Amino acid sequence: MTETESAILAHARRCAPAESCGFVVRTPEGERYFPCVNISGEPEEYFRMSPEDWLRAEMQGEIVALVHSHPGGLPWLSETDRRLQVQSDLPWWLVCRGAIHKFRCVPHLSGRRFEHGVTDCYTLFRDAYHLAGIEMPDFHRGDDWWRHGQNLYLDNLEATGLYQVPLSAAQPGDVLLCCFGSSVPNHAAIYCGDSELLHHIPEQLSKRERYTDKWQRRTHSLWRHWAWHASAFTGIYNDLAAASTFE
């Protein structure tokens, strides 16, 4: 554990049951934690930083992360957290249950423009799992890889911690592999429950839609991560709600 991380955890303990808040700042001497005062009217439920604290942190160096805590709460960013994180364009570090959970500032899961290898179906799957607290590796994928003898999903899923489950056992957070104009599975979607999926197909924005007969016919298999648990979908749901509210 770094000195910065130790300082973050100590500050969170001192502030509890109120939420702590602060910044990780990169200075010429290295990264350091810059604690702030939570000026929220409901500090046990929310945090708010003063503009003066933000300015003082910026004067110390480059802000590389915003930090706050969820005392007695959940280890995922809330709906409000996600909305504010995207606006801040910063990584957010969340202290919960004595640990620091670090979240990259990924775009909202719905409403993304498609760009193969940058914001595509795998990016959406990877970012959704990141918000749920599970890290998936990124990897190079050339255009139309499925037309050039590659089978990237089936060749990599087990090695990254997923295992196949029966379609009849689908749970929110499971990954649907589909054959989209291909004889091999070349498309991933997140099953959201209630016959709904979240995915990103070419020439469309990422979105939720019904898991209709059309997509059921295209489905190759269903996969689940060994570290997945039902409550992890909270991190995904909070982002979807934040994007809906923002729109």
Model regions and ranges:
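...with weaker cross-activation on analogous glycine-rich loops/strands in unrelated enzymes
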Residues: 142-206, 212
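Active-site nucleophilic cysteine motif
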Residues: 115-132
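Conserved beta-strand-loop surface patch within small alpha/beta domains used
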Residues: 1-65, 71-103
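Glycine- and charge-enriched low-complexity intrinsically disordered segments
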Residues: 209-247
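Surface-exposed patches in mature extracellular/periplasmic domains of secreted proteins
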Residues: 136-141
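Hydrophobic, well-structured mid-protein blocks that either form specific transmembrane helices
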Residues: 92-120
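Extended, compositionally biased flexible segments
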Residues: 58-74, 205-206, 210-221
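Short helix-to-loop capping/linker segments positioned immediately adjacent to catalytic or ligand/cofactor-binding
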Residues: 10-13, 109-116, 164
